[in-house]
């Protein structure tokens, strides 16, 4: 009798629990945005000391450490400057730390500056529109303590370029390697695409050009994407080419093109859509489409692709599709013009918090209309914090004296939406 009573009691308890779970309303935790603490590692490249001088400047609003690769870092500081380092400068700091390397090439006729942002190490990177006649070279450094292995892929308008010795390249810790991209390596009379992929570890990589066409350092596009924006194309004479690569070995890519200017955007006549076969690189002259005006190029593709705009005529400069500003970044004041591009359908706002060499603080903000670009002068000294709540705004710094450099600017901030934590006593 007692066993039956206990059994009936247990059944009633279970039935009550099931009924409660069905009848009681389910509460969904509220979602809120939280900022996750992020640390950032940057590598600042250097040039050949026998041909010129390298100067590295790094800034932040918080302390960071910096120093030559495989050497003791500096004491914690918010402002780091060094001349003529013998190895790349490695920086470890907050998500907003940023810096630039300036390499001045001495020339009997005139000095040429190559300026590039310090950037995180990568596992993949692509450059498009690389001319084998311009004295270009892929320069990569293993900035980590463990060894890495990289593969280099080349693409032309007719397909992949088979070059022996470009697979399973060892990248030893602390070692910088240079791979010349010239006619001896690549028999091509048209621009090609260069891609580096790390099958083990990661590397810091740049494309360097020193030749008759000009002088340039260029960061890679770090991953193929379906929505790309190339900002910071300055006004002026000379040729502008849009170079795109579809590295997919089996699927073609269909790409729509939008040219963004200061007063609006448009689809260039005859170039509204570009179709690309698998494993192909292409180069399209967009000089007439831009009309000598400052511009940004927005691409939307049904397959992940990579893209670069190359400027030639008097000097050479290239800028690849870049990530969004991504939170905030603190840049050293190096002058030039800051270009801001907003590809979204809504107005975006960029905040600028400047601090000059005397410590005077200035706060300002600018609104960027949907599908337009906007320019503002960039300070020549001190620091500038750039920040935005937009997830798509791109920023590029254009320096045109003594030579042309285009610097894509992005931060390392992360904001993510997560459910608010809730107490669940039933889980123990």
Locations of regions flagged by a protein language model:
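Exposed beta-strand and adjacent loop surfaces of beta-rich binding modules
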Residues: 135, 147-151, 191, 239, ...
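Hydrophobic alpha-helical membrane segments, chiefly transmembrane helices and signal peptide h-regions
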Residues: 5-25, 194-196, 255, 297-299, ...
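Intrinsically disordered, low-complexity "prion-like" regions in eukaryotic RNA/RNP-associated proteins
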Residues: 59-62
């Amino acid at each position: 009798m007692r066993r039956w009573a206990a059994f009936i009691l247990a059944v009633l308890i279970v039935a009550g629990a099931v009924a409660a779970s069905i009848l009681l309303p389910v509460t969904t935790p509220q979602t809120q945005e939280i900022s996750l603490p992020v640390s950032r590692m940057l590598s600042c490249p250097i040039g050949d000391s026998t041909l010129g001088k390298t100067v590295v400047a790094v800034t932040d609003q918080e302390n960071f450490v910096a120093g030559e690769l495989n050497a003791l870092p500096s004491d914690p500081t918010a402002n780091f400057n060094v001349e003529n380092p013998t190895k790349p400068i490695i920086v470890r700091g907050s998500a907003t730390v940023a810096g630039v390397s300036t390499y001045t090439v001495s020339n009997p006729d005139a000095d040429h500056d190559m300026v590039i942002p310090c950037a995180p190490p990568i596992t993949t990177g692509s450059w498009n529109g690389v001319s084998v006649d311009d004295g270009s070279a892929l320069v990569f450094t293993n900035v980590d303590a463990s060894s890495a292995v990289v593969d280099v892929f080349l693409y032309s308008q007719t397909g992949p370029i088979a070059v022996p010795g470009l697979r399973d390249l060892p990248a030893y810790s602390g070692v910088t390697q240079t791979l010349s991209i010239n006619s001896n390596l690549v028999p091509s009379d048209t621009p090609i695409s260069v891609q580096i992929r790390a099958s083990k570890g990661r590397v810091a990589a740049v494309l360097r050009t020193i030749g008759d066409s000009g002088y340039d350092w260029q960061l890679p596009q770090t991953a193929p994407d379906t929505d790309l924006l190339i900002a910071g194309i300055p006004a002026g004479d000379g040729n502008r080419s849009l170079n795109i690569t579809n590295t997919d070995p089996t699927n073609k890519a269909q790409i729509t093109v939008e040219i963004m200017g200061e007063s609006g955007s448009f689809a260039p006549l005859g170039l509204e859509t570009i179709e690309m076969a698998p494993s192909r690189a292409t180069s399209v002259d967009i000089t007439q489409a831009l009309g000598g005006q400052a511009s940004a190029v927005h691409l939307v593709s049904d397959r992940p692709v990579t893209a670069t705009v190359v400027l030639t005529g008097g000097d050479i400069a290239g800028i690849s599709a870049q990530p969004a500003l991504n939170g905030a970044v603190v840049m050293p004041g190096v002058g030039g013009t800051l270009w801001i591009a907003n590809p979204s359908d809504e107005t975006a706002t960029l905040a600028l918090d400047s601090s000059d060499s005397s410590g005077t603080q200035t706060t300002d903000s600018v609104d960027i209309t949907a599908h337009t670009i906007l320019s503002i002068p960039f300070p020549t000294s001190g620091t500038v914090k750039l920040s935005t709540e937009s997830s798509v705004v791109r920023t590029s710094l254009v320096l045109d004296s003594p030579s042309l450099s285009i610097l894509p600017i992005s931060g390392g901030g992360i904001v993510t939406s997560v459910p608010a934590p809730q107490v669940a006593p039933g889980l123990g």
